[in-house]
């Protein structure tokens, strides 16, 4: 075994931990189908949200980690449950009244409310695929509608009929009495209306491959379970799909956890082997509620990318997948700055094992670009934007160029993008909420001390020396907690509760400019 393999197999980075579980489940052998299958799922009832991207990004991290550990070929499929009946109309789509007329219809049988594709389901699928394509995910797209209608699942559906009683014995104890009386794993597609029916099944015939139900008029209707004439309920569907496609690895949100045992048991009943599974925690909105495609109560993919590079979004997905995290606009600056820190550490690190533990290794699948920001962070640019209120990024570059003459927009495109992002973020989230603290007499003494200090130092004074001088002024002012001191300065000078390290900020903004800012508050 190579040293690289040794470092990878010993790594505690979660993608490697998951990859080792897959390798162990295979006993190091190539599956009969010739590859290891990774599957992600998508419910196209509403527009894809950032959690959809997150599942695919995380899945690829595990896939690439597995490829470090083994030369067994891999494949990733993204499976869309687009044959599901519409149960709820999303609030964030055009013409919701039109869509409401198609309740219980398969998503691929509803007209496209956006007017671009052959159906509502096709539009939602296209939105997901365009994003996955844009960011270089290598995957095969599977449509539930196509799989059912093309007969890909026919053999398994016949087996569900053959194992009907066994599956019902598994499922019925999980329901209330009222639901037990009507439940069946099969949902016929109504020959007249095209709706996905949740009706009691009066008769099932494995040899004929049919089920029989009563329509509203009391007539017995017999339909094949094959060829797209029936769809399985979502819990049996999950397990059937694992067995039919021979899935080796799947991850799903915590909302699936209670049913994961059922998925696995149904897979076994149908002769399959359940995949290795990872349950990740759900994202929460600003109020601590689960984010939802139908509500649109979170950041969209496009929203994040309006204010920050995609790498910062990937870092958010990488961090602690089994811990619930609040996902709203205020998490963006922190993730950008953490990405910058991890990137710099990666390129300074010579120990390969430590590189494997660095999130950027998994974000970039081992091919980590080197970025240079000269110590300028996103947060620092936001604060610079806050004091100079620029109309465009050229104003920020005026300060950046003085701070670091070697930096230019052409030679440092990452920093150039950050400047543009910072202005957008400031205008949309900070500017309207600035609230300045009117300085007290005590504050004015402090501000005068800062002004005197700035008048005494040279322009080339190092940031740490300036930071220490600011710190010493706070100590002299008699604050019990220096956090309160810095908070007062941020509120007086920036109109914010939080802010930068003043030493670095003053170096970037300029001593003379800082003097003007302080004088303006005296």
From Swiss-Prot:
InterPro entries, sorted: aa-tRNA-synth_I_codon-bd_sub2, aa-tRNA-synth_I_CS, aa_tRNA-synth_I_cd-bd_sf, Lys-tRNA-ligase, Rossmann-like_a/b/a_fold
Pfam families per UniProt: tRNA-synt_1f
Subcellular localization: Cytoplasm
One term of GO molecular function: lysine-tRNA ligase activity
Gene Ontology BP, a term: lysyl-tRNA aminoacylation
Binding site for ATP: 293
Keywords associated with the record: Aminoacyl-tRNA synthetase, ATP-binding, Cytoplasm, Ligase, Nucleotide-binding, Protein biosynthesis
GO annotations of cellular component type: cytoplasm
Motif ('KMSKS' region): 290-294
Enzyme Commission numbers on file: 6.1.1.6
Cited Gene3D superfamilies: 1.10.10.350, HUPs
The keyword Ligase is assigned to this record: yes
Motif ('HIGH' region): 44-52
NCBIfam families according to UniProt: lysS_arch (TIGR00467), PRK00750.1-2 (NF001968)
Protein family: Belongs to the class-I aminoacyl-tRNA synthetase family.
UniProt-recorded name of the protein: Lysine--tRNA ligase
